[in-house]
UniProtKB/Swiss-Prot annotation:
Keywords: Aminopeptidase, Cytoplasm, Hydrolase, Manganese, Metal-binding, Protease
Protein name per the record: Peptidase B
Organism in which the protein naturally occurs: Escherichia coli O9:H4 (strain HS)
SUPFAM superfamilies the UniProt entry points to: Zn-dependent exopeptidases
Residues spanning the membrane: none
Residues reported to bind Mn(2+) 1: 200, 277, 279
Amino acid sequence: MTEAMKITLSTQPADARWGEKATYSINNDGITLHLNGADDLGLIQRAARKIDGLGIKHVQLSGEGWDADRCWAFWQGYKAPKGTRKVEWPDLDDAQRQELDNRLMIIDWVRDTINAPAEELGPSQLAQRAVDLISNVAGDRVTYRITKGEDLREQGYMGLHTVGRGSERSPVLLALDYNPTGDKEAPVYACLVGKGITFDSGGYSIKQTAFMDSMKSDMGGAATVTGALAFAITRGLNKRVKLFLCCADNLISGNAFKLGDIITYRNGKKVEVMNTDAEGRLVLADGLIDASAQKPEMIIDAATLTGAAKTALGNDYHALFSFDDALAGRLLASAAQENEPFWRLPLAEFHRSQLPSNFAELNNTGSAAYPAGASTAAGFLSHFVENYQQGWLHIDCSATYRKAPVEQWSAGATGLGVRTIANLLTA
């Protein structure tokens, strides 16, 4: 094992020879990061990415100034999907070290799960990984049910069954109940619903290669809400929360769904399929119906749902939609506390009517006359939330995954959003 490179923090600027914009300098003792007080966490993360780019795979965070947030910022930039890295952490008090360890365990799980190849991570594997993670932190406070394949059709989960039936790997619904009260009649405080499309070819509305090559990550919403529940549990969540993961492949076969098909949901809504690549909303609808039936105080769904959200925000922010201004404000406050990027986009009553169909109550995609694709997708989902005007948040996970590295992130999953949702659950 090579000797660790020492990484220290300084509030003094770098020597002028490094240039006026230098954020780090190198000497015989190691590497010094020069904090300027403006965006110290971002500076640390960007510097860590550069350090990894130098091929330095063993570091020691040394000296004064390190806390859990700064250590975590370093790790966010330093971690990458290829190769191994070792960090020797500084001395932290027990609470800060526990917080850091929980982030490393759970958010790394989210990133690694999203990065996993689709060949290794099908619908059943995703559901089981989620069960294993939550059980690891919650023990016997968790019960769950897995429904798959034809059982979904027989029980009326027609959106999930329709999307997933084209794959040899059966679609799966995971319904997990975290109940720390021990009372089977305890009210459900919150429901989390995640889109778990383990590979999205687009179906017969097939994607081009440039848009399909990252579609192993189309289960990012499911991984995010799973991680959020696990992380909230480590922070002392003492209320009952249910998790619904809607897991499927969206593939082409002789049994795959087709344009013009009509799906009838358990709440009576009929949906005409006019784009098989708008499948995420079709599977989420089943999860939202189940969530609404629990009568929780809040429902949060998360999905890598639309390209429109990425067009608006890039990969830098998660898009937030809600009719509930107070609840949206609470989530944005949680995001600010956790230093995670969320941005609210419009969702109005008229978006709910911008999915007209000649043959059903709803179309699963908007027409050229209604180009606000992220907002109309949220409007579609609202039809499956019983009390959509209160207590419902929709997160379009545009910051979940990066196809290419940037100055602060490696290629792949980011894990962003986990801490924000956990913060809201435990507030």
